[in-house]
Amino acid sequence: MKFLFVLSALASLAAAQSVVIQAPAPGTTFAPGQQFVVDVDRPDTITGSQDVSVAIGLLSCVGQAPPGTCDGVNTTEEIGTVLFAGPYTPQLRPGGADLFQNFTVSVPDGFQAGAAALSVAHFTLVGELAMPVLEVITETVFVS
Ligand SMILES: *[C@@H]1O[C@H](CO)[C@@H](O)[C@H](O)[C@H]1NC(C)=O
Ligand SMILES: *[C@@H]1O[C@H](CO)[C@@H](O)[C@H](O)[C@H]1NC(C)=O
């Protein structure tokens, strides 16, 4: 019983550490070679958690999903071309209540035109027990 409680408490704790892609907006169109900022946000929670790293990937959905969509593409299995992989050390947003970090990345030259899944894989250690949590969040963007 107690164990179950601890597990569910950890699960909600883990959910509270979840990141969001603040920018770019879903549906944004980029040209191959174009630079853009991926703004990775998380709430400034009082519960202890230690962010470790993120990986940002871009996966073409062309031929894997109905045209113009990424429906059914599972980015927990692959994030595609890795645009960034390294430490995640978010800072308090000026004038805001959340933590953020901007990553400047570029669409690879010659990237397949069409819908693409932009993913952020986020690795964090949650709570006093340092429970390792890996989450992958994704949005659909377009490459022209
Ligand atoms: C995505 O893939 C993972 C790992 O294979 C699997 O656990 C999960 O159920 C899949 N999700 C969907 C929506 O298919
Ligand atoms: C981070 O990126 C967002 C979205 O592009 C932008 O509004 C903000 O000014 C950037 N912040 C910094 C400090 O570069």
For each feature predicted by the language model, list its residue ranges:
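Fungal secretory targeting signals
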Residues: 1-20
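N-terminal edge beta-strand
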Residues: 15-41
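A cross-taxa feature marking solvent-exposed loop/turn segments within ectodomains of secreted
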Residues: 17, 47-49, 111-113
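Exposed beta-strand and adjacent loop surfaces of beta-rich binding modules
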Residues: 18, 51-53, 138
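Short structured motifs
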Residues: 21-26, 85-90, 102-106, 137
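Contiguous segments within soluble domain cores/interaction surfaces
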Residues: 35, 43-92, 121-122, 133-134
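Internal, hydrophobic beta-strand segments that form the core of beta-sheet-rich folds
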Residues: 99-139
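Interdomain boundary/hinge segments at the C-termini of tandem beta-sandwich modules
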Residues: 141-143
